[in-house]
Amino acid sequence: MTKPRAAVIGSGFGGLALAVRLQSAGFDTTVFEGRDKPGGRAYVWHEEGFTFDAGPTVITDPDCLEQLFALSGRKLSDYVDLISVDPFYRLCWEDGHTFDYVNDQAKLDAQIAAKNPADVAGYKRFLAYSEELFQEGYVKLGHVPFLDFKSMIVAAPQLMKLQAWRSVYAKVCDFVQDEHLRQALSFHTLLVGGSPFATSSIYALIHALERRGGVWFPRGGTHALITALATLFQELGGTLRLSTPAKTITTQAGRVTGVELAGGKIEAFDTVASNADIVHTYEKLLGHTKRGRSEAKRLKGARFSPSLFVVHFGLKAEHPQMRHHTICFGSRYRELIGEIYGKNNLANDFSLYLHAPCATDKGQAPEGC
C-alpha cells in the first residue's frame, strides 16, 4: 500500500517536530527548508571557534522532547546531551542587589528572607498557585488551541477561579511585597514577548514548569537539538531538502494539492503543513487563494508582540562571574515596559538579558575565551 505523502515547509523546531510525528505515523514526509541548514529561526553560525545560536536559549520541558523521540522507540539522550543550568537565572538590579533563581528551596528561602522575611511564606503560596495553573493550563490543556480568551474560559472554567484574567504581575503582588521579588517572579513573560503587566496570569505556570523540569542547555548549543531532530527524522526515512524554498502551496477546489518550489517545479502531496512565519504563509504561500488573502489582511492589522534586538559577540578572556543566564533590570521596570508596549519607544535605560553559554558548555568558544 502506498504511504500518504506529507510536506512540511520550514525546518524550525515546530516543523521538525511535526515531521517526526508524521513520519512516525506512517506518512512519507518531506521537509522543505529555504536555508542551507535546518533550524529556521534557530539557525547557527560558527566563526573563529565560537558558536553563535540564533534560536531560543532556554529549554524548560525536556519531557516533551523525550516523548517525541519515544514515538519511534528512540531515546533523546542517544542524540543530544542536555546539561542542567544552575542557577536558572541570575537577576541583578542597578542598586547592586542580585538574586540567583535556583531549584534549591533552602537557597531560595534564604535569599527571599534576606530581602523580606514575610515573603518566604508568600513565595510558597505563589509556588502553590503556580502549581495549580500548571496542572490546569499545561497538563490538562497544553494540547488545546485557544483562539481567543472566550474559548479559553469555555474550555477551562477553573482558570476563572484562578483569576486568569488578571496579569502575571498583579497576581504576584498578591503573594510577595518586595519589588525585586515581584520582578523576579514576573519577568518570564518578557521572554515570550509579553508584558507582565498585561499578559494573563496563566503564564505564571512557567515558574512551576521550571521548578519541576529544570532549565537545560544542549551540549554543543541550541542547534545541536535541531541536528538531533533532523537526524532522527532522516533515520525514520524522512526527506530533508535544504536550500529549497517553497514558493506557494498549490490548491484545487479549496483543497491543498502540493507545493510549488521557487524554481517552478510542482510536487504533489496529500497534506501540507507550514511552519513558516504565519503572515508569510497566508500572504505568499497561500496568497493566490481568497482565504490566504483575507487571513493575511487580518493578521497584518493585528498588534504583534515585540521581538528582541540581539548582539552576538565573542570575548578574548574568561569571565567566571558570569552565569549562563543573567538578566540586568533597568531602574524603571514598570515605566520602561510601559514605554515599550504602550508607546513603541526603546529608552536608553533598557534592561539586558546576557546569555553566556560557556558558563555551562566550554565548547561554545575557543579555549581561554
Enumerate the language-model features and the residues they cover.
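Rossmann-like flavin
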Residues: 92-199
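Generic structural signal for well-ordered, non-membrane alpha-helical segments
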Residues: 58, 101, 119, 123, ...
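Mid-domain catalytic core of redox enzymes
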Residues: 247-366
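Generic, well-ordered alpha-helical scaffold segments in large soluble proteins
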Residues: 15-16, 21, 25, 171-175, ...
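N-terminal glycine-rich phosphate/pyrophosphate-binding loop and immediately adjacent elements
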Residues: 3-132
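A short, glycine/Asx- and small/polar-enriched loop/turn
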Residues: 95, 195-199, 250-257, 367-369
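Helical element adjacent to the flavin cofactor pocket in flavoenzyme catalytic cores
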Residues: 205-260
